[in-house]
Amino acid sequence: MAIRCGEVQKLATIPGKGFIEGPSYCPDDGFLYFVEIEAGWISRVSMDGKYEQFYNIGAPGGLMGPNGMIYDSKEKRLLIAHRDMGVVSLDPKTKKAEVIVGDYKGKKFNGPNDLIIDSKGNIFFSDPWGTSISNPVGSVYRWDAKTGQTDAFMEHMAFPNGVLISPDEQFIYVCEFGQNRVMRAFLADGGKSHVFMHAMTYFSGGMGPDSMGMDMEGNLYVGHFGYGKVFVVEPRLGEVIEVIDVPDKEATGTDNARFGGPDNKTLFITEGFQRNIYKVPVSIPGLPIPYIPAG
């Protein structure tokens, strides 16, 4: 199916300072949740643009706060990659927060950044802070829902950021921000390991791919930080097949693109510098998180 994107519209400009990230639509209450990184807030906006702060999860030092976030439609919870706390679960109804994983072999993470969950409840999350092209020590970890064990899943990366899994759970995709590319690997052993990791898509200019969403056909919607664009990448050859521009020239910090809305056919884009949230109708619905095929 050809991708058709409608007009990009601004849903809201969020008051305050600091970056916003992690747009996550909750179908139970119709709000789009997002994080205010430096302030430590999990906030939300209604579909008519009304904003409210929802839950303060904390941000020690003003930077060690929440970053990536997804809505787990199976368990009806928000999952948050928190730079200081690790991976945290938050119930939107009760506001009960619980740390799922806070360390690896007794040592705190460098700072989790983004995450995804598979159909079995296993969580994959990136840990990029303190890494660079010259010091590629970033990792993607896998938390096992059955055993509670955490393993280093992908290593030696230059600021790994957004993480996604293909609809058939055969591939994992990671935005390697420091190298300005999207990496892809085959999942093996039922998702417990990976093989044949390679660069799928390179970008030129800008700072790097940040976070991304996926539609039902497996296309990636990559928010590129520094460009003010979302690149739609087809998964077979890694080619850019569409470019979505945000309408404000100064809004170049496009840090995430995720699906939501009543029919899951609205793409929500967060922009960090101007604290804008955009929405755009799309022809192919987004992939539910987690995606559990019928039957």
Please provide the spans of the model-predicted regions.
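Predominantly a core beta-strand signature of beta-propeller blades
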Residues: 7-10, 50-54, 95-98, 148-151, ...
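Blade-level signature of beta-propeller repeat domains, shared across WD40, Kelch, NHL, RCC1
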Residues: 256-295
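Short loop/turn segments immediately following the C-termini of beta-strands
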Residues: 37, 82-83, 128-129, 177, ...
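Beta-propeller domains
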Residues: 31-57
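A short helix->beta-strand "capping" segment at the edge of beta-propeller domains
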Residues: 1-18, 47-49, 55, 197-198, ...
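Beta-rich, blade/repeat-based domains predominating
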Residues: 14-29, 58-84, 105-123, 131, ...
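Short loop/turn segments that connect beta-strands within beta-propeller blades
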Residues: 46-50, 91-95, 144-148, 186-190, ...
